[in-house]
Amino acid sequence: MARSVTLVFLVLVSLTGLYAIQKTPQIQVYSRHPPENGKPNILNCYVTQFHPPHIEIQMLKNGKKIPKVEMSDMSFSKDWSFYILAHTEFTPTETDTYACRVKHASMAEPKTVYWDRDM
């Protein structure tokens, strides 16, 4: 009985330790197809290598939140870091700016990464 209690305690302590590790997310913003002004496309925000799993992702057009954003299911890598894809339909123009803003416990303030149409 004492062995079982000790084993359960060690497992719980190990799991708690997993949440103590924080990894800062890596953020990539890119379009599905090469951009053409006035032609509908898909804008992706791929967020990887973060821990713990709780994360907030917003996609922005000219600094304002885009309301219709879809999210993939969150998944994890072999190192227990997480990744997720946010995406939305958009029609690029010469003057509009697009970005992805990510808020995570590992960062003091949200990070915004802008879409570079030349990438």
Swiss-Prot record:
Gene Ontology MF, one: structural molecule activity
InterPro entries assigned: B2Microglobulin, Ig-like_dom, Ig-like_dom_sf, Ig-like_fold, Ig/MHC_CS, Ig_C1-set, MHC/Immunoglobulin
UniProt entry tagged with the keyword Disulfide bond: yes
GO biological process terms, semicolon-separated: amyloid fibril formation; antigen processing and presentation of endogenous peptide antigen via MHC class I; antigen processing and presentation of exogenous protein antigen via MHC class Ib, TAP-dependent; cellular defense response; cellular response to iron(III) ion; cellular response to nicotine; intracellular iron ion homeostasis; iron ion transport
Gene3D superfamilies registered for this protein in UniProt: Immunoglobulins (2.60.40.10)
N-terminal signal peptide: 1-20
Recorded superkingdom: Eukaryota
SUPFAM superfamilies: Immunoglobulin
Keyword Zinc listed: no
Keywords per UniProt: Disulfide bond, Immunity, Immunoglobulin domain, MHC I, Secreted, Signal
Main location: secreted
GO CC, one annotated term: Golgi apparatus
Record-linked Pfam families: C1-set
Subcellular location: Secreted
Disulfide topology: C45-C100
All residue ranges annotated as the Ig-like C1-type domain in the record: 25-114
PANTHER family, alphabetized: BETA-2-MICROGLOBULIN, MHC CLASS II-RELATED
Family: Belongs to the beta-2-microglobulin family.
Function of the molecule: Component of the class I major histocompatibility complex (MHC). Involved in the presentation of peptide antigens to the immune system.
Subunit structure: Heterodimer of an alpha chain and a beta chain. Beta-2-microglobulin is the beta-chain of major histocompatibility complex class I molecules. Forms a heterotrimer with MR1 and a metabolite antigen.
Protein name: Beta-2-microglobulin
Species classification: Eukaryota, Metazoa, Chordata, Craniata, Vertebrata
